[in-house]
């Protein structure tokens, strides 16, 4: 956390008797409040991979962000137990893919690049016939598209998209505009949100690390593979709160400006924000009701409406009273 990116409303300190820095959680708790980024192989469905992770770690609940079809490989973040509450927020993150597209006719590289540029921006898409979702026309945004290689009718390209964009349909549309026709041959997801290929591990890696911990008591490898759930909130604007405000939020209260220690300067009214303790523990996800400047300046008012509480009650002491702000 770079302090220059924050307004310091109250230079508060934290009591080491309560809570725990995420990376120092006991192993069992670390797993329950963690996530693992699996490099999904070709063949199994996303659901099957999630079930395998649940069985490997011997936990009761797992969830994934962004379904990959059985033939698609790549980045599949899987959330464990307490961390599954984060799934909804990561599902909305942008996605990056590398796709091998096959043209149905000959075309020049420069013509393919020109057509690809036409698709950067907001586009209309109707889900493919094989898709399980309702076949209604939707607007999706293509943030970037880059032709990487072209050999004959095979085109390798990288694309960064809004969540919910169908790459198979994108390939068909490119082929239609190009006049040759085209289809998706292979697809790999290389990033979802802040999770890239460099953070991914195989199912075998996870199994080996878990067995090593269980049989040898060595935690290092499992801690490398499993990340604290706080990592998933790294892209969200942050509000850091005092110890005295934590338990009130865990009991359902909204965040008062009086409970704020630091507020990131990029917090805007109505934006989704992550609320952290001074130990960098994720307390909740909320919606900002003020801009950062107002949260910093005002002495009364509600800074954020709490949408999802992540921390259990009783981790921090109750020092609040039931009263209107």
UniProtKB/Swiss-Prot annotation:
GO MF: RNA binding; tRNA pseudouridine(55) synthase activity
Entry-linked SUPFAM superfamilies: Pseudouridine synthase (SSF55120), PUA domain-like (SSF88697)
Catalytic activity: uridine(55) in tRNA = pseudouridine(55) in tRNA
InterPro entries, alphabetized: Dyskerin-like, PsdUridine_synth_cat_dom_sf, PsdUridine_synth_N, PUA, PUA-like_sf, PUA_sf, tRNA_PsdUridine_synth_B_fam, TruB_arch
Keywords from the UniProt entry: Isomerase, tRNA processing
EC number(s) recorded for this UniProt protein: 5.4.99.25
Record flagged with keyword Membrane: no
Active site: 69
Domain PUA: 236-311
BP term (GO), one: tRNA pseudouridine synthesis
NCBIfam families: CBF5, PRK04270.1, unchar_dom_2
Main function: Could be responsible for synthesis of pseudouridine from uracil-55 in the psi GC loop of transfer RNAs.
Annotated family: Belongs to the pseudouridine synthase TruB family. Type 2 subfamily.
Name the record gives this protein: Probable tRNA pseudouridine synthase B
Species this chain originates from: Archaeoglobus fulgidus (strain ATCC 49558 / DSM 4304 / JCM 9628 / NBRC 100126 / VC-16)
